[in-house]
Curated annotation (Swiss-Prot):
Mg(2+) binds at residue 260. InterPro entries: aa-tRNA-synth_II, aa-tRNA-synth_II/BPL/LPL, Phe-tRNA-synth_IIc_asu, Phe-tRNA_ligase_II_N, Phe_tRNA_ligase_alpha1_bac, Phenylalanyl-tRNA_Synthase, tRNA-bd_arm. This is Phenylalanine--tRNA ligase alpha subunit. GO terms for cellular component: cytoplasm. Its EC number is 6.1.1.20. Its cofactor is Mg(2+). It catalyses: tRNA(Phe) + L-phenylalanine + ATP = L-phenylalanyl-tRNA(Phe) + AMP + diphosphate + H(+). Tetramer of two alpha and two beta subunits. Binds 2 magnesium ions per tetramer.
Length: 361
């Protein structure tokens, strides 16, 4: 056994026998300190022949490297052991005592509640949920939906545009959830039955409008769906959502670039008192816009308008939440006021279903 091998064995046995940081440091100093066994041998390399130096030097450096690695491993073990010991001795119970009568404090935001109600109603009628990006291209937000160049919706004062990219194109914050209709029709074959709840953005702000608001749109595409089906769908939805046995509706001619014919739908109500009552009275409130999908929109996504048809509609989630639950100012929805949420919010464990009151408060 050479001198270096014997030295290696001694040092490694000492390292293995070290029981704490103090003993480990003593081994380090004895081996690698200023007057340590390895340090002294490295200093003495100049006193031996060149041939021996070529053998002994690398061997000593390799031994020094292995010792440092083992030292680091042992230190890590000691640190983890010390931490575990300290935690076992210094354990603190950070939990609060349970209230004698637990009180529900959290509340579901009215927007989240209404979205759940919408999903429950439309899912019961066979619709699935679709989603898409908030940041859209001009094509999906306008062109594919039959918005011509120069349409007012393309103006800067109505739409949030991003800066132009290297190709001169600008993306937008979507002004409606209609782009998702295009994306779904590009990927799926008929029949299609979807609703698309989500955030939309327009330059508008007052008591009944917000620059960011929530909208739900729906789309039905097949070979036979017609206006009669669309009218039945809206009537069924309004009865379920506003929780009334019957409701009168009127369909007024309107214009949307992506539907033809287009209509706006009003619902019968009574606004004579402090709150709006649906299914009775002599007043009318606009509730949504709808129409048969424009043939050009079908062509844009590869559907043959001579074979396929369908209808689409959209309504403001914030608006119908205000109408149903009597909230006067849309801006309060987004003020993060816990007092407002405590008043208008919903209990966390109330689940929207068609077998109980949807808006159980």
């Amino acid at each position: 056994m050479s001198d270096i091998e014997r030295l290696e064995q001694e040092i490694f046995l000492a390292l293995e026998a070290a029981c704490d940081e103090q003993e480990l440091e003593a081994v380090r100093v004895a081996a690698l300190g200023k007057k340590g066994s390895i340090s002294e041998r490295l200093k003495a390399l100049g006193n031996i022949s060149a041939d021996e130096r070529l053998k002994v030097g690398p061997a000593l450096n390799e031994l020094k490297k292995r010792i440092l690695e083992l030292l680091a491993q042992k230190r890590d073990i000691f640190k983890r052991q010390a931490t575990a010991l300290r935690l076992s001795k210094e354990r603190v119970d950070v939990t609060l005592p349970v209230r004698s009568s637990p009180v529900e404090r959290g509340r579901i935001h009215p927007i989240s509640q209404v979205i759940d109600e919408l999903i429950a109603i439309y899912a019961d009628m066979g619709f699935s949920i679709a989603e898409g990006p908030d940041i859209e291209t001009d094509y999906y937000n306008f062109t594919a939906l039959n918005f011509p160049e120069g349409h007012p919706a393309r103006e800067m004062h109505d739409t949030f545009f991003f800066s132009e990219d290297a190709t001169g194109n600008r993306k937008v914050l979507r002004t409606h959830t209609s782009p998702v209709q295009i994306r779904v029709m590009e990927k799926k074959q008929a029949p299609i039955r979807i609703i698309i709840p989500g955030k939309t953005y327009r330059m508008d702000s007052d008591a009944t409008h917000s620059p960011m608001f929530h909208q739900v749109e729906g789309l039905v595409i097949d070979k036979t769906s017609n206006i009669a089906h669309m009218m039945w769908l809206h009537e069924t939805f309004c009865k379920a959502f506003f929780e009334v046995p019957s409701v009168k509706m009127r369909f007024r001619p309107s214009f949307f670039p992506f539907t033809e014919p287009s209509m706006e739908v009003d619902i019968q109500c009574d606004r004579s008192g402090s709150e709006v009552k649906f299914g009775e009275g002599h007043d009318w409130l606009e509730i949504l816009g709808c129409g048969m999908v424009h043939p050009q929109v079908l062509k844009n996504v590869g559907f043959d308008p001579d074979e396929y048809q369908g209808f689409a509609w959209g309504m403001g989630i914030d608006r119908i939440a205000m109408l149903k639950y009597g909230m006067p100012d849309l801006r309060a929805f987004f003020d993060a006021d816990l007092r407002w949420l405590d008043h208008y919010g919903f209990r966390c464990f109330d689940i929207s279903t068609l077998f109980s009151r949807l808006g159980n408060v």
